[in-house]
Regions:
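N-terminal secretory signal peptides that target proteins for export/translocation
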Residues: 1-4
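Bacterial N-terminal signal peptides
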Residues: 8-20
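Basic, often amphipathic N-terminal segments
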Residues: 25-117, 130-219, 223-238
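Conserved active-site/ligand-binding neighborhood in enzyme cores
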Residues: 120
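Short aromatic-glycine-enriched beta-strand elements
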Residues: 123
Length: 238
């Protein structure tokens, strides 16, 4: 069970390792989109995340860079929604963000962590959970719930490979996000990349100078392979 949860958590971080693919992208009766409502970190967090990402790439050049196709972000909610209702989803999320005003918050990053998928691991910068973050997530869940559907197919995700790069575990993760990654299980973080477990253990053993930052905005993304924020659907105005 623990190993299963670790693999599922790795998908949530933004990059899974060694997972089964779902063949083909079967059509659904009504188009569905897999979305990630995310906070965009400010320059302070982005600089820290990119610096850490560069360290990981020096150790493991086959990893991924934080760039236009791997946006540094803090996932608040991942769901399947009806594509025809996307504008309603954007409006509902915007209303919540306008009320909460997350760009006025100060958040604290306090450690690295990684999810093992031996011999590799997916690393992130962990953000201290706050009542504000929990409240925002709760409100987003309520606001988007009328437009959600239980599950989706690979066609719901951004793919340049006809859906063949979409993992079955990823579909399950998005389907069960509220149960498995919200509330007491919410672990706010910014993914920084992938490296060997040996390197990550050494990295985590070093002191982590905590720092503060603020959200600079928010967006709705279409999820891609391994849960990456691949395509911005709407920039929100918190």
């Amino acid at each position: 069970m623990r190993e299963h949860l670790e693999v599922i958590s790795a998908i949530g971080l933004g990059l899974g390792l060694a997972m089964a693919f779902v063949p083909g992208a079967a059509a659904q009766s009504s188009p569905v989109t897999a979305i990630d409502i995310a906070l965009e970190p400010d320059a302070t967090m982005i600089d820290h995340a990119k610096a850490a990402n560069e360290r990981l790439l020096q150790s493991f050049p086959k990893g991924f860079s934080l760039d236009e196709t791997h946006h540094p972000h803090i996932s608040m909610l991942q769901q399947f929604v009806r594509t025809d209702d996307l504008d309603k989803v954007f409006a509902a999320a915007n209303a919540v963000l306008a009320n909460e005003k997350p760009t006025t918050w100060t958040l604290k990053a306090f450690k690295y962590y990684y999810i093992p998928a031996a011999p590799m691991g997916v690393a992130g910068i962990v953000i201290e959970p706050t009542p504000d973050l929990h409240r925002l997530q709760d409100e987003l869940i309520k606001a988007v719930e009328p437009y959600t559907v239980k599950t989706g197919t690979p066609a719901a995700f951004f793919s340049e490979d006809g859906g063949r790069d979409i993992q079955g575990q990823l579909i399950s993760y998005v389907e069960n996000f509220v149960r498995d990654a919200a509330g007491k299980r919410f672990n706010p973080h910014v993914t920084i990349g992938v490296a060997t477990e040996k390197f990550l253990k050494e990295m985590l053993a070093q002191p982590f100078p905590s720092f503060t930052f603020s959200p600079a905005g928010a967006s709705v993304y279409q999820l891609g392979s391994f849960g990456t924020a691949r395509k911005e659907l709407k920039a929100l105005t918190p």
